[in-house]
Amino acid sequence: MEKRRKSRWPWLLAALALVLILLGLDYWNLLPHRTYTAEHFGIETLQSPLDADGDGIDDYTDLMLGARRDAENHPAYDPGYFAGGYPPEDRGVCTDVVWRAFQNAGYDLKALIDADIAENTGLYPRVQGTPDPNIHFRRVPNLRVFFERYAESLTTDPYEIAEWQPGDIVTFEGSHIGIISDKRNRDGIPYLIHNSGQ
């Protein structure tokens, strides 16, 4: 009987170790989780009446798909300065997710921001008097000013789940930016598509 008890301990310890490993992987979101959509929560997904690039996909969806495409490319985090302004496709920061999403929808966000900075330089905190089209469209504080001027401000409460729509743009205290996904967690809170050096 004594021998049998001893032989169970390695199995029990191995099972306990496996459970602890799985709990740790789940805690740090390293295991795949089921994702949900707005429809799972009875939320209507809004569609833009516009289709700037004429591809048959509304602009809100195009923004979200463009952001997802950029994230799937896994660009290396690189806040560097690039002649012409645009980093290579395999490089970028959080703001690059946004202009690439707009590009996917048929908009030249860089040109729009550059034009507004040229006309309203004093409103943009990162410009410091001299516009530089090679970098200013890639700075979160400048994007925040631009979107505050030309976009509708929505809720910042993540628990107002019906208010969050795919393609929405979110800024965080002027230091980070991303685009809302069409995927949500089990509580209905949408995921953010962004680049933070992941």
Mark where each language-model region is.
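N-terminal capping segments
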Residues: D26-F146
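...with weaker cross-activation on analogous glycine-rich loops/strands in unrelated enzymes
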Residues: A118-G197
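A residue-identity detector for tryptophan
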Residues: W9-W11, W28, W99, W164
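Intrinsically disordered, low-complexity regions enriched in serine, threonine, proline
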Residues: M1-E2, L31
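N-terminal Sec-pathway targeting helices
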Residues: E2-V19, L23-D26
